[in-house]
Curated annotation (Swiss-Prot):
Full protein name: Small ribosomal subunit protein uS19
Role this protein plays: Protein S19 forms a complex with S13 that binds strongly to the 16S ribosomal RNA.
A Pfam family recorded for this sequence: Ribosomal_S19
Signal peptide residues on this chain, from the entry's feature table: none
Source organism of this protein record: Nostoc sp. (strain PCC 7120 / SAG 25.82 / UTEX 2576)
InterPro entries listed in its UniProt record: Ribosomal_uS19, Ribosomal_uS19_bac-type, Ribosomal_uS19_CS, Ribosomal_uS19_SF
């Protein structure tokens, strides 16, 4: 179940104000954020946002295809190291 249309998309206020400032000045800087739940809006396209994954900030370049998704979708929090190796060779 999605968010109500009358509410509009969620975006953290501090993140929105930083992006609007950069758009007014026509600047491109890396913006650090911990707000993984913020929705990507069209005014964010072209910016690089460093999204926190629990350990470090992962730089995410925003493209048009990402609009409508959440920032956290592009900064994975878990590292897959493969399934456990079988010990069949040791049992021979």
């Amino acid at each position: 179940m999605g968010r109500s249309l009358k509410k509009g998309p969620f975006i953290a206020d501090h993140l929105l104000s930083k992006i609007e400032k950069l758009n007014d000045r026509n600047e491109k800087q890396v913006i650090k954020t911990w707000s993984r739940a913020s929705t990507i809006l069209p005014l964010m396209v072209g910016h690089t946002i460093a999204v926190h994954n629990g350990r470090q900030h992962v730089p995410v370049f925003i493209s048009e295809q990402m609009v409508g998704h959440k920032l956290g979708e592009f900064a994975p929090t878990r590292t897959y190291r493969g399934h456990g190796k079988s010990d069949k060779k040791a049992g021979r």
